[in-house]
Amino acid sequence: MLGSSVKSVQPEVELSSGGGDEGADEPRGAGRKAAAADGRGMLPKRAKAPGGGGGMAKASAAELKVFKSGSVDSRVPGGPPASNLRKQKSLTNLSFLTDSEKKLQLYEPEWSDDMAKAPKGLGKVGSKGREAPLMSKTLSKSEHSLFQAKGSPAGGAKTPLAPLAPNLGKPSRIPRGPYAEVKPLSKAPEAAVSEDGKSDDELLSSKAKAQKSSGPVPSAKGQEERAFLKVDPELVVTVLGDLEQLLFSQMLDPESQRKRTVQNVLDLRQNLEETMSSLRGSQVTHSSLEMTCYDSDDANPRSVSSLSNRSSPLSWRYGQSSPRLQAGDAPSVGGSCRSEGTPAWYMHGERAHYSHTMPMRSPSKLSHISRLELVESLDSDEVDLKSGYMSDSDLMGKTMTEDDDITTGWDESSSISSGLSDASDNLSSEEFNASSSLNSLPSTPTASRRNSTIVLRTDSEKRSLAESGLSWFSESEEKAPKKLEYDSGSLKMEPGTSKWRRERPESCDDSSKGGELKKPISLGHPGSLKKGKTPPVAVTSPITHTAQSALKVAGKPEGKATDKGKLAVKNTGLQRSSSDAGRDRLSDAKKPPSGIARPSTSGSFGYKKPPPATGTATVMQTGGSATLSKIQKSSGIPVKPVNGRKTSLDVSNSAEPGFLAPGARSNIQYRSLPRPAKSSSMSVTGGRGGPRPVSSSIDPSLLSTKQGGLTPSRLKEPTKVASGRTTPAPVNQTDREKEKAKAKAVALDSDNISLKSIGSPESTPKNQASHPTATKLAELPPTPLRATAKSFVKPPSLANLDKVNSNSLDLPSSSDTTHASKVPDLHATSSASGGPLPSCFTPSPAPILNINSASFSQGLELMSGFSVPKETRMYPKLSGLHRSMESLQMPMSLPSAFPSSTPVPTPPAPPAAPTEEETEELTWSGSPRAGQLDSNQRDRNTLPKKGLRYQLQSQEETKERRHSHTIGGLPESDDQSELPSPPALPMSLSAKGQLTNIVSPTAATTPRITRSNSIPTHEAAFELYSGSQMGSTLSLAERPKGMIRSGSFRDPTDDVHGSVLSLASSASSTYSSAEERMQSEQIRKLRRELESSQEKVATLTSQLSANANLVAAFEQSLVNMTSRLRHLAETAEEKDTELLDLRETIDFLKKKNSEAQAVIQGALNASETTPKELRIKRQNSSDSISSLNSITSHSSIGSSKDADAKKKKKKSWVYELRSSFNKAFSIKKGPKSASSYSDIEEIATPDSSAPSSPKLQHGSTETASPSIKSSTSSSVGTDVTEGPAHPAPHTRLFHANEEEEPEKKEVSELRSELWEKEMKLTDIRLEALNSAHQLDQLRETMHNMQLEVDLLKAENDRLKVAPGPSSGSTPGQVPGSSALSSPRRSLGLALTHSFGPSLADTDLSPMDGISTCGPKEEVTLRVVVRMPPQHIIKGDLKQQEFFLGCSKVSGKVDWKMLDEAVFQVFKDYISKMDPASTLGLSTESIHGYSISHVKRVLDAEPPEMPPCRRGVNNISVSLKGLKEKCVDSLVFETLIPKPMMQHYISLLLKHRRLVLSGPSGTGKTYLTNRLAEYLVERSGREVTEGIVSTFNMHQQSCKDLQLYLSNLANQIDRETGIGDVPLVILLDDLSEAGSISELVNGALTCKYHKCPYIIGTTNQPVKMTPNHGLHLSFRMLTFSNNVEPANGFLVRYLRRKLVESDSDINANKEELLRVLDWVPKLWYHLHTFLEKHSTSDFLIGPCFFLSCPIGIEDFRTWFIDLWNNSIIPYLQEGAKDGIKVHGQKAAWEDPVEWVRDTLPWPSAQQDQSKLYHLPPPTVGPHSIASPPEDRTVKDSTPSSLDSDPLMAMLLKLQEAANYIESPDRETILDPNLQATL
């Protein structure tokens, strides 16, 4: 990414120089190219004048210019080219300009997005710019690919780009004007510019330098950055003053600095807010220009398009990258970087980025672009990637810094901040979606945005804004230094780190601040960087400082050596810095300077989510995200920062090889991360954004090997990080809090590194290789700078850190110590496992993030689906993870630093944690089970980390932290995650403690945020679970805290990370309302319940499967036993036959021989006694077998128990299974065993099995019996019991035998054998019985468990939908359903169902259960459709229930069967009532139904209780209505086809005034009443008496109406008594519809959208006068009997009546149907007659026949009466009127003839005579006068005669027009309607 970024940057530089083909690219590419050129491309291009590396720096520096709106041209000699580039950029990037952008356009020449480039092209870089084109082409390949068609119009395009940039900026949300004006482009570019043709830029840079405290460094950096820092002089002065104060205050001791910072922040914030409002336009413009593609959400359209383009490269690069980039947009950082396009590059990376960051909104877009750039840069150079990564940080820092002014202005209100927060949140969640997400960001619901951004921004942002403005800058710097130190430290090891850290702050921070910020100084950037300056650019500055410093330092050393590669490193470093800064910022945000931090956050917010993401989120992302997060943002933004920070990046990269790898690799990943970035965006806003991204980053690292895994990729870095971190912690250790802060920063850095390495395992090695060197180089020099910066920043940072660290940092530190030791190992492990892991991650950066997220937030899920499945979740989660990572990283690098700052107890836990983490990391990379604990913890947060970290801290510490957080507010959020986790997770967490600790806050926070987003639900559930595992208390505390702190969007984890934001949010969280929090808490609670219920379901399911296995095994054993029994039976038979043979032989011998006789006699005697003995003994053995139980249940109970016990032993049957069924078993056993089983045992089993197979088991019996023995207690019993029992009989027989002859001995032996075998057989039979019994019981328990699972599913469903049915009803139904199968079952269910609502409920006796619903019983259910009762219109009685039909269901019916039954009934009903299917209703129209008091919603899980209940025979079906955004319920009630109903509603909603005209009796009034009810329901207003006002124009005059409407209009205008204003006015029976339009328009003069709906009806055809018929205010709907809805209404109505009268009368349904079908024919015949012989308004409507009775006899009498008394008189009158008006139009036909011929009932002939004739109208006495009368009539009526057809034609035309637009409208309307509904 970085590589491509760099490339892009160069082309952009080219563009600015006037490169013709880069112009389009310029908006994004400009910044990028500027950055790249600064870093790489600018080196050559800008170096042109200045020379190689120096050149780029100089160019950069030169580019920084302060311009006045007036001095656009002077400012940028190449203004036009710049403009072109800019325009193109904007065009490419942004679709339109905001007002601010337009203002910027005024400065277009100077404002060209390529400010840096433009200046080059214009003056200093004119030539360079031209040369740049080649570079730009070369470098911006990726950029080109991202922003295609941008490159070509380099010069020319740039000018357009400038305007476009404004377009980009245009999004009003980009308060870029100030930022834009103070557009520190890129450090490198600045330097280059200063050398080349500093001209205006140079002047600006010098000014900035002069203004900035760090003049020298800024100067160099200014040259380097040379980004055109277009600063409004006034703004610059103000900002510089503030910044100087901030810087000065930073030099003070931490406390005074903090106080001063707070004051400065407040002042700056006020100033900025004032300037913001004035500059907002210009700022936006500038920002837009600079941000061009990425500027803000405003830039979204363009940004989206460009982003899309960029997304492409990223996408191809990271797979999911592209979408993520867009998601990245969400991360403000990304967005900021995006702006980076021109400004970032000009500012050179950090500053420019930050400028862009200012727009915060563009962040999301910027993020995308930046990411894209990063990705592209990555392509070019891993270093670049890192640079880009750093850029993110820088962006955060710088943009924040620079943008702080804007941001501050922007942060005019916390509401802006919250808005941004929301936007960020939205981005976060939406970013996952892709570039469209970006677009949607602005449109994303505020809640979502708020979720993410607010979460971050809430605490972090507000605090950040308040304190961070200054504090954050300090913090940022501190953290940045720390991070840089960290980065370098990790690369350089402890010494390097601490030194580096320090140096970097001085060198890097100062340098970067000085140079880079110096330019910003014009903007007050340096101050920003320092706390002093932070106020205006609080968010940006800190990040910028940190990121910039790190990047710069790195960039300086590496800038020359590494150039692009180093740039990447720098970016990485910066990013880390940013991360740290973000962290610090968080802390700072928590601090008083909240105003400033907030402003920046607000700025972001103002920009809406993308900016927040950029500003705060970016920082957090960058910092928190560490590599991943940053890279994410970097991906979008870092490219530019890369330019600015190339040198810096180098350091960073070298500092963190792993980081670099992530940079290169991560860039891609980061792209993926961009989605997380969205989350991150939110995170960023909160300052937790970083963490969130970090979470993503960390996740991968954790996944790799927890930290080790990640670290291995960046192993070198980790080592350095560990030591570096340690050192940084001390640096930050002014006090313990400082140390904590530092440790945190270090950890973050480390995490970042980890992240990075993991993020880009493959590139990590390369990057690491180069980075370590670069890092060291950069690290050493930057360390001093950093230290200095740190000193300034530190106090705030410390304060922030104190807060943050107190929670996350302290613990992280302690855990870090342990971790530190382990880090190397982990890293080593990582190297081992990191490779694969990285590969995993690398392949799909997004997936990696997902993995991270999944592993942390959902370890289990992670296991199951590393990448895509969780990706959605993961992105949000990733953000959380990033945050977590930030924390984690801190522990990693904190290990050594942490010991000093953190309590010893914490470290001990951490040691364990590292190990665990190590394992976990490995597991993460590969095994689904990263260790259950790990998984859980991670699940929680990667979340586990948070928990672990906190636990590591030690519960006490956690508590303390919590308390401190609570006090601090902001810290609390950080702590929150920690605290909640530690209690429950102490042990496992401690193992993971360090990382978790660090990560936890982020992860926790992120998860919350994530939860807010799409991921939230899952994550929340997981988090809840994790929390629960960690400790329910913890999770509960965590959640509420998160919610409270961050609003309702922050997850506990999120809260932790967003604690700063949260605090800030508390200060200015106008958006986090208690209600939202409550909702969030409720959601969390419900999610928790859902999770638990899901877990239960899973557990039960697994149990069920286990049971199924058991049952299968049992059945198998039963089969075996059966076969054994058969064998035994066969052997027994064999023995019997042998015995008989023996007897016969003995008898034979007796006869033959006396001895033989004696023997035979003995044998005979023996045989006679043996059977009895055998039987008795058998019983004895039986008894002995079942000894204990035999008394009560005979042997069956005992044997069953013994068998149970033995089987358990033998088969290892699940003890729980048995115990779970214990109660059921005992109860079932009692009755069953005693009765049925013993009987079976004695009778069935023995007999049946004995004879079965006598001969098969002689030998087998012996074998079988042992096995049986082992398997069952009875067989054992036989052994043991037989011992005593056999002996007696045995001995007796033996003695007797001895006394008798030898043959008798043989006989006795045979007898004893037979007896033993028979005993064995008996035992086996008993075993069989027992096993059968057990099998039965198992089946029963399985059934019960199935019921339990069903109940759980139902409960799950209930939880998903809402608080489900009362548990009271649930219990009752459980027994019922269980009773279905058998009393025993119901009993068992009641006993074993721990799930059962209550035993009392399930106390139904078995018999009750059976009687409730016998399995064979059939229940007839009556299905009705119930309409919601509405009493809106007086005297309007409407049917409440519509009978559909009956359905017979069995007593065993379940919900699925019942659903099908209801569907079938409804389908049959519709087919009967509407055979032509014109209504458009189907089973899809059913929303749900209720039986008894249980409601079943079809799209949800069925209720827990089974549907069968005694005495229930009614099912009430509800159809989809307003709540489901459907009109099916209304269609069903009115019988008007669905498309027409939707059309009517759409006309009403669109025009608010409708007149229905048509013959009387066509249902117009009925329809108006229904429409009025619908509108009332849709409005959501309380139904009052006057909500619908009805005027009957027959009874009331037009004057009354006019007076009423005038009063109404006055009432509405005064806005008094609005509640009494009717929503709908019904005008019934208008006599002259034409005049009503004028009357209403004249009287109702209030605003159109406040007017009530007006629906009129008229029986007269509307005369289409010019004033009325086509009048715009009223829409006409003509009802004709010839078309729907009137012509089909009668058929449908009568058929419905027939169905509803379902009774015995309908025995002759066919005849009745024939009669009812005749009625519409009759009506149509009469209608045709009246058309011929009457006037057009004298027609007969279907309502004449609605009173038709159902039943042939009733119908007969009704019809004869109707015909004679109603129809004939009406026809006569109509005919008379027709003759008067038209004369004789046609030959007269008596309608009665047709009626008599077609009478449908059987006895029709008798009734024909009863029907009256219709006599033809007689002219009578007037016949003579009739001709003249006719003539006069004809004379006077030609117009009416002619107009009638014309009218009809016009009406038809209008109707046709309405219908023509209706398909459109319906497709639009449907969504429209649904949306409005």
Curated annotation (Swiss-Prot):
Alphabetical UniProt keywords: Acetylation, Coiled coil, Cytoplasm, Cytoskeleton, Developmental protein, Differentiation, Methylation, Microtubule, Neurogenesis, Phosphoprotein
GO cellular component terms, semicolon-separated: axon initial segment; cytoplasm; microtubule; microtubule cytoskeleton
Gene (name only): NAV1
PTM annotation (Phosphoserine): residues: 90, 142, 152, 194, 199, 296, 308, 312, 362, 391, 452, 474, 476, 490, 528, 541, 648, 750, 754, 760, 797, 808, 1000, 1181, 1265, 1382
Tissue-specificity statement: Broadly expressed at low levels. Expressed at high levels in heart, skeletal muscle and placenta.
Protein name stated in the entry: Neuron navigator 1
Keyword Coiled coil annotated: yes
Domain of life according to the entry: Eukaryota
Polar residues: compositionally biased ranges: 615-635, 645-655, 698-710, 724-733, 751-773, 1246-1264, 1366-1383
Short name of any one Pfam family annotated for the protein: AAA_lid_NAV1
Compositional bias segments (type: Pro residues): 902-913
Function: May be involved in neuronal migration.
An individual GO BP term: neuron migration
Bias-annotated ranges (Basic and acidic residues): 476-486, 503-519, 555-566, 581-591
Keyword Acetylation (UniProt): yes
Compositionally biased spans, kind Low complexity: 32-41, 205-214, 301-315, 411-425, 433-448, 805-818, 1181-1200, 1265-1275
InterPro entries in UniProt: AAA+_ATPase, Nav/unc-53, P-loop_NTPase
Compartments, record wording: Cytoplasm, Cytoskeleton
Modified positions (Omega-N-methylarginine) in chain numbering: R688
Matching SMART domains: AAA
Annotated region described as Disordered, given as residue ranges: 1-59, 114-225, 294-336, 386-839, 892-989, 1172-1204, 1244-1306, 1359-1383, 1810-1843
Upper classification of the organism: Eukaryota, Metazoa, Chordata, Craniata, Vertebrata
Predominant cellular place of this UniProt entry's protein: cytoplasm
